[in-house]
């Protein structure tokens, strides 16, 4: 009926996206908050869009696993998918798009579709899953997702390094990445 629908998750709104600028309905997805199944042997989890990232990592952590994208705020998985959330760990782990394997979506017409698959490698057909990730809810609303998980690192080390200028800092970052140490997070603070 040409009524705009805007999905809303945890309201972290770091991007300002859940504002219905053209009127219409705001659909609160926060009660669709079930972790449907964790499959440790497959490094996968099935979730509803209202699951909070910290809650997912708490439950996956019981199996020695975690969902790496960390936008800073405790966003919902649906919001992270809608915005292709990333964070300081992107340098090693990538963004949300790198972990979404399968989606169940409701299109603006009301039609329910399934994209992707649970196989780690699939090269047949169009990659509709990647089309929806980062579309900010404009192409449809996520109602379920299958995500890849990673093993929790056995060791962690944090360091703060001061530099006199940006050139020295960027040179050190390039050297660190080139060394093969594989830092999980890097952040430049003024």
Question: Where would I find each of the regions flagged by the language model?
Answer:
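Gly/Ser-rich phosphate-binding catalytic loop and adjacent alpha/beta segment
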Residues: 17, 40-41
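FAD-binding subdomain of flavoenzyme oxidoreductases
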Residues: 34-38, 45-187
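Short active-site oxyanion
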Residues: 2-3, 43-45
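Glycine-rich N-terminal segment of FAD-binding domains in flavoprotein oxidoreductases
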Residues: 1-32
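Short, glycine/charge-rich beta-strand/loop segments that flank catalytic centers
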Residues: 8-17, 71-78, 188-190
């Amino acid at each position: 009926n040409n009524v705009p629908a805007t999905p809303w998750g945890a309201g972290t709104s770091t991007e300002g996206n859940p504002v219905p600028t053209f009127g219409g309905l705001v659909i609160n997805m926060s009660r669709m908050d079930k972790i449907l199944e964790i499959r440790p042997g497959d490094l996968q989890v099935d979730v509803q869009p209202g699951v909070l990232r910290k809650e997912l990592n708490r439950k996956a952590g019981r199996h020695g696993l975690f969902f790496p994208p960390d936008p800073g705020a405790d966003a919902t998985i649906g919001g992270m998918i809608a915005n292709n959330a990333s964070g300081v760990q992107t340098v090693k782990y990538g963004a949300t798009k790198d972990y979404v394997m399968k989606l169940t979506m409701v299109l603006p017409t009301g039609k329910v579709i399934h994209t992707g698959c649970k196989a780690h490698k699939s090269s047949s057909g169009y990659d509709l899953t990647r089309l929806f990730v980062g579309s900010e809810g404009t192409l449809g609303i996520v109602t379920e997702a299958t995500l890849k998980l990673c093993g929790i690192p056995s060791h962690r080390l944090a360091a703060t390094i001061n530099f006199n200028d940006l050139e020295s800092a960027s040179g050190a970052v390039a050297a660190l990445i080139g060394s093969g140490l594989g830092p999980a997070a890097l952040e430049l603070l003024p």
